[in-house]
Amino acid sequence: MGTARFLSAVLLLSVLLMVTFPALLSAEYHDGRVDICSLPSDSGDCLRLFEMWYFDGTTCTKFVYGGYGGNDNRFPTEKACMKRCAKV
C-alpha cells in the first residue's frame, strides 16, 4: 500500500510540473517574482463552470474556470482584473 501511494504522489507531482512549467516559462518576472498578469489564461483541471476574468496583455477578458488548478491570472470580476493588471 505504501509503494502505491508513493507512486501516486510521484505521478501527481509529475503532472503538475508538466502543466505548470510551460506557463512559468512564458511569464514575465519582476524582482524575481512572476507577474501574474503575464500568465496565459488557464481553465484549470475540473469541469465546473465558473465565469472568471484574466488579463490578456491588453485588457481583461472573460473565460470559464473549471474550479481547480490553473494559475493566478484569474479574477472574479473585470474590475478586480483591471485594478491588478491594467497599466495606467
Curated annotation (Swiss-Prot):
Which residue positions hold the site described May bind Kv1? 39
Q: Which PANTHER family is this protein grouped with?
A: EPPIN, WAP FOUR-DISULFIDE CORE DOMAIN PROTEIN 6A
According to its UniProt record, in which tissues is this protein expressed? Expressed by the venom gland.
CDD domains in the record: Kunitz_huwentoxin (cd22598)
Q: Which PROSITE patterns match?
A: BPTI_KUNITZ_2 (PS50279)
Give the propeptide segment as residue ranges. 28-33
Q: Which residues form the BPTI/Kunitz inhibitor domain?
A: 37-85
Q: What is the name listed in the Swiss-Prot or TrEMBL entry for this protein?
A: Kunitz-type U15-theraphotoxin-Hs1f
Identify its protein family.
Belongs to the venom Kunitz-type family. 03 (sub-Kunitz) subfamily.
Q: Which residues form a coiled coil?
A: none
List localization entries: Secreted
The role this protein plays is: Serine protease inhibitor that inhibits trypsin at a molar ratio of 1:1.
Mention one GO molecular function. toxin activity
The species is Cyriopagopus schmidti (Chinese bird spider)
The superkingdom listed in its UniProt entry is Eukaryota
Q: Does the keyword S-adenosyl-L-methionine apply?
A: no
